């Protein structure tokens, strides 16, 4: 496989098409105008404004800011810089000042808050434009996650394949009037980047190498997991992967009655595990609620094993960890969400593993509202706690494309 460094692509990523420059400056100043003209000559979109009044959180397409800090604008510039950093953006910030202010301590107080200074008259506008564009490109490369970065680098090389998919980069659609409409509606890039998995330049999910494997490791870090695997067909297939990997015929599985049918298929039909069902609440309006709290009680669960007609050996109820796996719908279809820590305090020591179906709550690891409601974010778990699985559908509550 050809090594591909996402941070140093063979063909430069066309950031001039992807990121813009925002200049909060005096556009009437001749040298400032020359600076902006040089940036525009590199085909970058340049937005000029005289006011710091802008909602930076609403415009994530900015690749660099140039802000005038002369006179009474200094404090406004500092507040603006802090507002950019406060939302987590690391967008390059350049402070623009007259050359006579190079020793002005007030301007130097911006050190650490901006990425560089533009002292018009000290260097040429062309040189400063190069510096700003270089910082934008470096910033753009830092934004690229492993797989998309590899894909952008691959696309930049204008590779062509004669394998599948049969639309051949969208060229098939261009051969008919209806196809032309389809092609133009989506644009060429979506077809050029629809690649066959046999094209190993972007890695291989089956043997876990290249950008695909790097993306899995990156996702694990982002979500707080030890390991992450990408699976086609969402949570349904992920549930079957986990249950078939963990369970074998005759194992006991603690089973939420709210579980999706994929868990019924994977755990009970395919793996052949024996369910101990957890009763769930349903109000007078038919809304699905949580498992009855008393049903998590250890004595109650062991008694359910003893009285289960499918369990032939009643002594299994006395095992230290009678359940090979617990399958729990973390968020019901009607919005009930479990406190994961509290549930694990009740049943964790009874299970080897717990699978949390997060199909409808894939965002819980990223908001303080859901503290203790995300399995991957739990800390300070004791030695009695089981192994934890989370299964998700990026195309449901994440931002992934829908699946056919």
Model-predicted segments: where are they?
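Structural motif
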Residues: 23-30, 50-52, 66-72, 96-100, ...
């Amino acid at each position: 496989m050809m090594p591909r460094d996402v941070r140093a692509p063979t063909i430069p990523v066309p950031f001039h098409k992807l990121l813009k420059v925002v200049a909060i400056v005096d556009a009437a100043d001749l040298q400032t105008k020359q600076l902006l003209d040089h940036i525009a000559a590199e085909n970058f979109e340049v937005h000029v404004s005289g006011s710091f009044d802008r909602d930076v959180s609403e415009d994530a397409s900015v690749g660099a800011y140039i802000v005038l800090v002369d006179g009474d604008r200094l404090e406004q510039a500092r507040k603006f810089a802090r507002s950019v950093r406060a939302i987590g953006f690391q967008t390059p910030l350049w402070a623009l000042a007259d050359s006579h202010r190079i020793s002005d301590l007030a301007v130097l107080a911006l050190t650490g808050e901006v990425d560089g200074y533009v002292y018009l008259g000290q260097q040429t506008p062309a040189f400063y434009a190069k510096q700003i564009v270089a910082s934008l490109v470096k910033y753009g490369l830092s934004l690229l996650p492993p797989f998309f970065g590899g894909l952008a680098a691959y696309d930049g090389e204008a590779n062509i394949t004669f394998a599948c998919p049969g639309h051949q980069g969208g060229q098939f659609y261009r051969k008919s009037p209806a196809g032309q409409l389809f092609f133009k509606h989506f644009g060429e890039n979506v077809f050029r980047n629809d690649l066959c998995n046999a094209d190993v330049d972007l890695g291989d999910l089956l043997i876990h190498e290249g950008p695909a494997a790097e993306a899995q490791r990156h996702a694990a870090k982002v979500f707080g997991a030890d390991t992450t695997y990408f699976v086609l067909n969402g949570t349904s297939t992920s549930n079957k992967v986990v249950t078939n990997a963990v369970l074998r015929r005759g194992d006991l599985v603690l089973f939420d009655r709210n579980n999706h049918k994929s868990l019924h298929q994977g755990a009970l039909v395919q793996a052949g595990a024996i369910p101990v069902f957890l009763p769930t609440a349903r109000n007078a309006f038919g809304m699905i609620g949580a498992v009855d709290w008393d049903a998590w009680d250890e004595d109650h669960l062991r008694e359910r094993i003893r009285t289960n007609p499918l369990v032939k050996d009643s002594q299994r109820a006395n095992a230290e960890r009678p359940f090979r796996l617990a399958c729990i719908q973390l968020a019901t279809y009607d919005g009930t969400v479990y406190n994961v820590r509290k549930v694990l305090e009740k049943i964790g020591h009874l299970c080897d593993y717990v699978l949390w179906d997060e199909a409808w709550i894939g965002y819980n690891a990223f908001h303080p509202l859901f503290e203790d409601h995300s399995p991957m974010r739990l800390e300070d778990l004791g030695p009695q706690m089981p192994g934890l699985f989370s299964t998700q559908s990026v195309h449901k509550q994440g931002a992934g494309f829908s699946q056919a």
